[in-house]
Swiss-Prot record:
This is Large ribosomal subunit protein bL32. Pfam families: Ribosomal_L32p. The keyword Ribosomal protein applies. Signal peptide: none annotated. Residues 1-26 are annotated as: Disordered. Keywords: Ribonucleoprotein, Ribosomal protein. GO terms for cellular component: large ribosomal subunit. Residues 1-20 have a biased composition (Basic residues). InterPro entries: Ribosomal_bL32, Ribosomal_bL32_bact, Ribosomal_zn-bd.
Length: 58
């Protein structure tokens, strides 16, 4: 099994890990009710998408 010949510094390790971060989800407000929702998804509170009611909610 391969082993490293020299120890990698913490800065080299951290530079390699810079692309492994998580991104926060892009949240927009629903134009009908104003509640937060994910873009290109049905609003969970009012059930509308692109101005049409797709799911009946109470």
């Amino acid at each position: 099994m391969a082993l490293p010949k020299h120890k990698k510094s913490k800065s080299k390790r951290d530079k390699r890990r810079t692309h492994q971060k998580l991104t926060a989800p892009n949240v927009v407000s629903c134009p009908q009710c104003g509640d937060p929702k994910l873009p290109h998804h049905i609003c969970p509170s009012c059930g509308t998408y692109k101005g049409r009611t797709l799911i009946e909610t109470d």
